[in-house]
């Protein structure tokens, strides 16, 4: 969900951290969740996002009842996107090996080149949505017992290239409390 290239009507889909898609087609994450629920098809085994910044706790919380797992990038994803050809063997299984999916993704991007220029960058995350409620409860306890005033935003690892940052590493946030 990138705020770059927003047009004057983009805010209609919600804040830039609450939707997926580009200028032409945007879907609010809560509406996406409701659409899955309303379809009656039940819970997905996984949802794979080939989009930037889609494995934050906010997305996982919103989709916790729609899917068992979320696969995606917690940061910006390279323009090439997901290397589906390498991932398909696992993605097509009833019970994918999520560790293997991550390993194949990392191996691909460790050797990725655009033209002759190496771009060995890529981040992937798999979230087990059955653990999201527990994480939310832990974070409530941590936030209630900590002085948030001591946290210096610029000291927390940013997960994006925006100025100012809008996505942060939750683990680093907790370590800085």
Predicted regions and their residues:
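Short beta-strand segments
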Residues: 1
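Terminal, contiguous helix-loop blocks that mediate binding/assembly
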Residues: 5-177
């Amino acid at each position: 969900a990138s705020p770059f290239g927003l047009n004057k009507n983009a805010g209609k889909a919600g804040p830039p951290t609450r939707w997926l898609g580009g200028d032409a087609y945007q879907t609010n994450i809560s509406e996406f969740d409701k659409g899955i629920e309303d379809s009656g098809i039940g819970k997905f085994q996984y949802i794979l996002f080939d989009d930037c910044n889609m494995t934050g706790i906010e997305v996982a919380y919103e989709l916790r009842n729609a899917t068992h797992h979320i696969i995606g990038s917690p940061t910006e994803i390279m323009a090439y996107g997901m290397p589906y050809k390498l991932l398909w063997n696992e993605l097509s299984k009833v019970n994918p090996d999520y560790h293997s999916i991550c390993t194949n993704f990392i191996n691909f991007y460790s050797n990725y080149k655009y033209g002759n220029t190496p771009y060995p960058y890529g981040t992937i995350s798999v979230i087990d949505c059955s653990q999201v409620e527990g994480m939310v409860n832990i974070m409530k306890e941590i936030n209630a017992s900590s002085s948030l005033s001591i946290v210096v935003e610029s000291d927390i690892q940013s997960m994006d290239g925006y100025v100012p940052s809008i996505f942060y590493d939750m683990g680093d946030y907790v370590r800085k409390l």
